[in-house]
């Protein structure tokens, strides 16, 4: 899980600064409530009674939940007259007696909305709008057939549209193994894509109109615009849809229609190459074209590509500690947090730098605060560039705190660690250190930092363990005394790494 923290953190940072869906203001009403209220006493029985029911898991204190509430209620009112009626329900997941329900349904944030089908046998995430009209339209589609029939060219034009990925199956008849597999996959993926089927390829706006099927045609608003497949093995068909629906280069800007592709980009297991340029400057289109050409060369080699407009990417700049004067720049991040960075990129350097990266000739980039020129306080300051030397190469027993400057618990612990460090000042075998985890990279394959403060202890012999004991001076000292090794370095000064000159272009400012 730790390996994905950096990726999800960046995704959150990116999307946080993009204009989001505007919710209607909450209004009070004495009208009948159409949203069912469920809890641990009636949840399972209610879900089992319905072929299709939507459940919101919420918390009363959640601002987004409060904004959603009137829209959700309005949608429930409208859908109550649908034939058949679509039932919307809610669970207060903040209530102690409902927390098992929240855990059972993998609720990790609020609001979380789930669609339960077939009495709860099939569960899907709700991925639709959060205003009443959008909720109604989305759930009408979700409660209907997984795939709709296209009977005319007008049907096809309306279905395909201009800015989304849709999948159409062309069949000589609506029966047989190929058709059954297509419908089964449509049912599985219906919350992610729109599916349709037809007996006549001539209705479709693009592609070979003479085919009689069976064939699957995927339409998309990017790259080659449509692509066909005749492999109806369910796994192969799902792989075809997943790969074909991903842009060769994902675009990140203020256009909401691009956001699903951005989410898909960050959910990919691939390494993630991100080129940041100013879309409005001269030469931007040349960069995009060259980047697309290079991306095509590497699209089957474990790298996904994104191009971001600087104006829309301030979250990424804060996350990585980048500066606008380094644009054009490219940064590649692995799921383990390792990064590779090239600032002030020239157009003709793009293919050669990426080739050097693929050949393993580019050194990883470490986000780091400047190495302190003086480090004389009892608790030693460690930064990204000195972490390896202080913790792993010093031959000392090192207790290191990973903290955040804004963290209240860290502030409470700070004077205690000072006292611990003072207690060991005469013992050169022991180092008490701290690292600002918001401004310096941490090797996530070594340290699992899920919250602040997180403390680790590495003995002189190399044994690494996370400290989860009491946070009093006495508890921490007792732990160190029990776990430290003798190094024979007593009465010698602890050597601190010297400050090194840092190239301006290669060391971004680290402010998060």
Swiss-Prot record:
Per UniProt, subcellular location reads as: Endoplasmic reticulum lumen
Q: Which cysteines are joined by disulfide bonds?
A: 62-65, 407-410
**Isomerase among the record's keywords?**
yes
Record GO biological process = protein folding; response to endoplasmic reticulum stress
Keywords, A to Z, come to: Disulfide bond, Endoplasmic reticulum, Glycoprotein, Isomerase, Redox-active center, Repeat, Signal
Q: Which residues of this protein are annotated with the site description Lowers pKa of C-terminal Cys of second active site?
A: 471
Q: Which InterPro entries match?
A: PDI_thioredoxin-like_dom (IPR005788), Prot_disulphide_isomerase (IPR005792), Thioredoxin-like_sf (IPR036249), Thioredoxin_CS (IPR017937), Thioredoxin_domain (IPR013766)
List all Basic and acidic residues biased stretches: 487-496
Annotated site residues (Contributes to redox potential value) in this chain: 63-64, 408-409
> This chain belongs to which protein, by name?
Protein disulfide-isomerase
User: What's the source species for this entry?
Assistant: Medicago sativa
